[in-house]
């Protein structure tokens, strides 16, 4: 009987991993669905209704991209108030993606004691139009849920502690529909460490199978739900990348433009870190200030708001209707706005908005130069991600499925250029301020 128990536990474990991955993918889809429904009501239905009511009394205000001119200011300031008060009274805020993965890699688990509060904290800034991504808060929630399941399945073997890592990989794979990035990111730069009861007791080959099962389950669930009920978010997909002699001549200038946009991100990150540190423990004041800045940017450049995943698909269809200067300015402003939101209490991720910044920047330069749009987008986005992440291979893995095979070389070269040129010292975060 004992000889049968171990193989049975392994099969049962792999089945649990597949189910866990599927549930993670379904949870990601559901989160995106709720986010889209909430944003649609708050930013389309509601201002449209207000605009129609005030059209006769104040026709000058019943204009603009939201149907009511001061609507972003009202909602973003109200959002800052809600987010700040929620953080102050609950003490719960989503951690950034690096912190989530660091805890999962180091401890093999993630705290799930406030999972419900964390879910709402991850959703609120997105609903109120924050220029942040869903990946950080959502990955933390899924890692916590997987830890909860692993703790309760532990009697079947220590291998069940792998559910947290597998769930994190599954979440990242579904979020970005990037299986290679989802597989590598949570494991990059880590050692096995000392083996013990708390460690994952799986040989390396079997461990890879476990993680791939989780990723397969997550992507399957996410894509199937998207087919059944309508696709929800994910990174944009470009069908073709034309690479001619003219485009190759522009590769370096485009990559440098993306790199400079990445420097803007780092400059804003350091500046708002210092501002946050100077303001001290005032979560409400910080969040309201971020709301005011967000509203001002959104009223002038509407695409600077929101995470950017849905907006990227919209921009693909209608970028030619916008002036090149507006698209390029949007890319730079959004890159500065994202760390501003993050450091002033609108917590979330930065990948989705930064990718959108690269897309907007690329389309702007495509209109300006007449070069192939997908090529410009690939070069600008990859260089921007390389400059922000400082890891060109990881940047390329993240964007791998956005572009066809012909664009991979362009992506790699641009990402290397973006990451290779050292970040100016003045833009590098202060260690003490960062910790504070």
Across the structure, where does each feature detected by a protein language model lie?
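Alpha-helical transmembrane segments and immediately membrane-proximal extracytoplasmic
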Residues: 1-436
């Amino acid at each position: 009987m004992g000889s049968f128990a171990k193989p049975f536990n392994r099969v049962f474990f792999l089945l649990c991993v597949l189910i866990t991955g599927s549930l993670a993918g379904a949870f990601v889809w559901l989160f995106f669905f709720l986010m889209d429904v909430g944003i649609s009501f708050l930013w389309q239905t509601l201002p449209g209704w207000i605009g129609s009511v005030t059209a006769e009394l104040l026709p000058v205000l019943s204009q603009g991209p939201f149907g009511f001119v001061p609507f972003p200011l009202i909602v973003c300031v109200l959002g800052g108030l809600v987010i700040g008060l929620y953080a102050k009274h609950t003490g719960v805020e989503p951690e950034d993606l690096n912190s989530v993965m660091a805890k999962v890699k180091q401890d093999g688990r993630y705290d799930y004691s406030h999972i419900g509060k964390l879910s709402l904290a991850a959703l609120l800034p997105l609903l109120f139009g924050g220029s942040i991504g869903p990946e950080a808060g959502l990955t933390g929630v899924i890692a916590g849920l997987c830890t909860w399941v692993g703790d309760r399945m532990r009697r079947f073997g220590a291998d069940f502690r792998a559910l947290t890592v597998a769930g994190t990989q599954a979440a990242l794979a579904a979020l970005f529909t990037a299986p290679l990035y989802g597989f590598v990111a949570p494991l990059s730069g880590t050692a096995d460490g000392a083996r013990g009861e708390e460690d994952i007791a799986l040989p390396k080959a079997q461990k890879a199978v476990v993680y791939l099962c989780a990723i397969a389950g997550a992507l399957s669930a996410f894509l199937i739900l998207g087919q059944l009920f309508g696709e929800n978010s994910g990174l944009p997909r470009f069908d073709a990348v034309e690479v001619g002699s003219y485009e190759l001549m522009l590769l370096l200038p485009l990559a440098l433009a993306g790199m400079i946009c990445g420097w803007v991100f780092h400059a804003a990150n350091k500046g708002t870190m210092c501002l946050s540190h100077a303001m001290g423990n005032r979560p409400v004041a910080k969040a309201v200030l971020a709301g005011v800045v967000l509203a001002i940017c959104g009223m002038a450049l509407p695409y600077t708001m929101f995470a950017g995943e849905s907006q990227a698909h919209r921009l693909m269809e209608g970028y030619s209707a916008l002036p090149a200067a507006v698209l390029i300015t949007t890319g730079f402003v959004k890159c500065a706005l994202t760390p501003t939101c993050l450091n002033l209490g609108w917590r979330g991720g930065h990948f989705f908005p930064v990718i959108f910044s690269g897309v907007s920047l690329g389309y702007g330069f495509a209109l300006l130069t007449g070069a192939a749009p997908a090529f410009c987008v690939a070069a600008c986005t990859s260089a921007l991600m390389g400059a922000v992440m400082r890891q060109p291979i990881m940047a390329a893995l993240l964007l791998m499925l956005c572009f066809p095979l012909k664009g991979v070389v362009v992506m790699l070269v641009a990402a290397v250029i973006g990451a290779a040129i050292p970040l100016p010292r003045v833009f590098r975060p202060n260690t003490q301020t960062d910790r504070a």
